[in-house]
């Protein structure tokens, strides 16, 4: 009799996706982050669901309901700490996953890459609306500053901002709709993840060498299920260490104060995973220009496949491109640092220089490096 997992209509899909899936034999630990992101999403949905059971999306009670979760609900403190730090782990895995895609040329699977960029934007939107929910000082002022950027759009900007707010300022209507968005978006993300995997399984995984791996494939289970399980252990170790020993180290102290529209915090800044984009936004002295630069910093990922000039897919054997890639990484870390600093010299000029370098690296230097490497590979005799 044929195995049930190969004949049953539902089991067959799971079998072709996670068990008998042919996978390249040489994919490294950098390919673990896809499965880790899936686990992060499940953790966030489950912890978020339990938090939503006790949370109230009202300006008068939101802050105290979060305090109630931490003090009175059984293991509420743990659920909240896992959810808050789980978001940081999610973004850490996301950035490493995108970085791996750029380094090894995975962006040449255009459909998978484009859905991935849409996923990144959706996760960022989810994290932003989620950060507003505790209704602390930084939640309120973060929501005010970021939603206010919509008013920079010519002609329809102010109308758009007021439409998002549900009034003339960030208030009860805003909090209620942000809770609704924060609840629904993870399920939209789940649907997009399935589409992402659908496109990926059309082509099969890329591999570190960047060459066609069809001549040497192995089954996903048990080889990569075990490998992913090891990655999961590391993820849980870091997440639990953060959540149990230092749960507030990545948060902002201002968020321990209830939202007060009459008192502006000295430094309004988002969570660490948005700081690079926030630094780019602040580096341009014009409001509309800043908003466009902020959008461009993420949407630039969509044109990376069009800027690939090298004959080789991966950067594994391309030292010049490798050097530029690590300069890009250092540049993004610098922008993250700048985003958390006050708007004063020398931070302003460092932020502006890093923002210019970022666009130069992606739009000019890396495509030129690809052409240079092609030239160097040509026989000279």
From Swiss-Prot:
Residues passing through the membrane, by range: 33-53, 77-98, 113-133, 178-198, 226-246, 288-308, 320-340, 347-367
- Tree of life domain: Eukaryota
Ligand binding (a ubiquinone): 201
GO BP term, pick one: mitochondrial electron transport, ubiquinol to cytochrome c
| Residues noted as binding heme b b562 in the record, renumbered to the chain | 83, 182
Cite the SUPFAM superfamilies for this sequence: a domain/subunit of cytochrome bc1 complex (Ubiquinol-cytochrome c reductase), Transmembrane di-heme cytochromes
Q: Where does heme b b566 bind?
A: 97, 196
Under the heading InterPro entries, the entry gives:
Cyt_b/b6_C, Cyt_b/b6_C_sf, Cyt_b/b6_N, Cytb/b6-like_sf, Cytochrome_b, Cytochrome_b_C_euk/bac, Cytochrome_b_N_euk/bac, Di-haem_cyt_TM
Q: Does the keyword Iron apply?
A: yes
Any single GO molecular-function term of the entry would be: metal ion binding
Record's Gene Ontology CC terms? Answer: mitochondrial inner membrane; respiratory chain complex III
Q: Which Pfam families match?
A: Cytochrom_B_C (PF00032), Cytochrome_B (PF00033)
- Cellular localization per UniProt: Mitochondrion inner membrane
PROSITE patterns per record: CYTB_CTER, CYTB_NTER
Q: What role does this protein play?
A: Component of the ubiquinol-cytochrome c reductase complex (complex III or cytochrome b-c1 complex) that is part of the mitochondrial respiratory chain. The b-c1 complex mediates electron transfer from ubiquinol to cytochrome c. Contributes to the generation of a proton gradient across the mitochondrial membrane that is then used for ATP synthesis.
Q: What else is known?
A: Heme 1 (or BL or b562) is low-potential and absorbs at about 562 nm, and heme 2 (or BH or b566) is high-potential and absorbs at about 566 nm.
Q: Which family does it belong to?
A: Belongs to the cytochrome b family.
> This protein is called what?
Cytochrome b
The species this protein was found in? Ningaui yvonnae
Gene name linked to the record: MT-CYB
């Amino acid at each position: 009799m044929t195995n049930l997992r190969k004949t049953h209509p539902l089991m067959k899909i799971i079998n072709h996706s996670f068990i008998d899936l042919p996978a390249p034999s040489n994919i490294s630990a950098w390919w673990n982050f896809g499965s880790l992101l899936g686990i992060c999403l499940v953790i966030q949905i489950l912890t978020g669901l339990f938090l939503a059971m006790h949370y109230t999306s009202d300006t008068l009670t939101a802050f105290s309901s979060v305090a109630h979760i931490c003090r009175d609900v059984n293991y509420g403190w743990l659920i909240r700490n896992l959810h808050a730090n789980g978001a940081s782990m999610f973004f850490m895995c996301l950035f490493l996953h995108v970085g791996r895609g750029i380094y090894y040329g995975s962006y040449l699977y255009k459909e998978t890459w484009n859905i991935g960029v849409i996923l990144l934007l959706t996760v960022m939107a989810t994290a932003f609306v989620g950060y507003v929910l505790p209704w602390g000082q930084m939640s309120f002022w973060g929501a005010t500053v970021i939603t206010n950027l919509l008013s920079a759009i010519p002609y329809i900007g102010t109308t758009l901002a007021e439409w998002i707010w549900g009034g003339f300022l960030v208030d009860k209507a805003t909090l209620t709709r942000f809770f609704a968005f924060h609840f629904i978006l993870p399920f939209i993300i789940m649907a997009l993840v399935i589409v992402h995997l659908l496109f990926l399984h059309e082509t099969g995984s890329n591999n570190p060498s960047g060459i066609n791996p069809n001549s040497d494939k192995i089954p996903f289970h048990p080889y990569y299920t075990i490998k992913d399980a090891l990655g999961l252990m590391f993820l849980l170790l870091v997440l639990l260490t953060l959540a149990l020993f230092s749960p507030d180290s990545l948060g902002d102290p201002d968020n321990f104060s209830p939202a007060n529209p009459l008192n502006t915090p000295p430094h309004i800044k988002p969570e660490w995973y948005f700081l690079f984009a926030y630094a780019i936004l602040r580096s341009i002295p014009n409001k509309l220009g800043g908003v466009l630069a902020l959008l461009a910093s993420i949407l630039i990922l969509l044109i990376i496949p069009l800027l690939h000039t090298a004959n080789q897919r991966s950067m594994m054997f391309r030292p010049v491109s490798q050097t530029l890639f690590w300069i890009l990484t250092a540049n993004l870390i610098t922008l993250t640092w700048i985003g958390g600093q006050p708007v004063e010299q020398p931070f302003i000029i460092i932020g502006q220089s890093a923002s210019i370098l970022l666009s130069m690296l992606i739009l000019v230097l890396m495509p030129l490096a690809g052409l240079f490497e092609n030239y160097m590979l040509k026989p000279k005799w």
